[in-house]
Amino acid sequence: MSLLGRIAEKTSRLSCLRLMSVYPTHYVEPIVQKYKQLEQKNDLSKLYHVPIKAAVNKSSDTIFHDDTKHKMINYITKKGNSALARTLLSKTLELIKRTQTEHMNLAKGEKTTINTNPETLLKQAVENCRPLLQVTAIKRGGVTYQVPVPITTKRSYFLAMKWLLEAAREKERKVSLPEKLAWEILDAAHGQGRVIKRKDDLHRLCESNRAYAHYRWS
């Protein structure tokens, strides 16, 4: 991994902290899911006298809730039509399931290595598409430099899902969005495709401008 990549990885934990947070730093995150409470029941006694943050509105303890799917639905939604967005994502996951099941049935070797869980493949695709760095324009002495800076965890997930949707929307009129999005997710989950290339191009741009990294603090 490059030097800039290591710097971004070390600062990833600090990057997600808000400068104007409502809660002080000694407040701990709430445990909403009941199965996680059962897993950590031996450690709950340590939290009796520790202040805990309030759970966010979107939190849910149902086993069917998935943060990645929830965020993807929000990014797909247009003009407040979230029902259509949920339908499109459901069709996308169904196509991924059918495609992977077909590959597994046609495989002659070890079939257990083929992942047929569409939700797992969606998470893997988003993780593979997350950038570590981005460039920002900083002007020094009348010259504008493209300075590489670490990217926050929240924005890295946003860019990964945004790039997947942009790649899916660049399609022919005869191809539906769920079909094209399923292709992009499968490609990204296997470390290939246009979105992976876009992330690599951004990292190469950051690497080529690493000489200007000190302008971030000046």
Swiss-Prot record:
Its GO biological process annotations read:
mitochondrial translation; ribosomal small subunit assembly; translation
Q: Which InterPro entries match?
A: Ribosomal_uS7, Ribosomal_uS7_dom, Ribosomal_uS7_dom_sf
Molecular functions per Gene Ontology: mRNA binding; rRNA binding; structural constituent of ribosome
One Pfam match, given by its short name, reads: Ribosomal_S7
Q: Which domain of life is it from?
A: Eukaryota
The transit peptide of this chain lies at 1-19
Q: Signal peptide location in the record?
A: none
Q: Which UniProt keywords apply?
A: Mitochondrion, Ribonucleoprotein, Ribosomal protein, Transit peptide
Q: Which GO terms describe its cellular component?
A: mitochondrial small ribosomal subunit; ribosome
Location in or out of the cell: Mitochondrion
Query: What does the subunit section of this Swiss-Prot or TrEMBL entry state?
Result: Component of the mitochondrial ribosome small subunit (28S) which comprises a 12S rRNA and about 30 distinct proteins.
Question: Family, per the entry?
Answer: Belongs to the universal ribosomal protein uS7 family.
Q: Which PANTHER family match?
A: RIBOSOMAL PROTEIN S7
Name the record gives this protein: Small ribosomal subunit protein uS7m
Gene symbol?
Answer: mRpS7
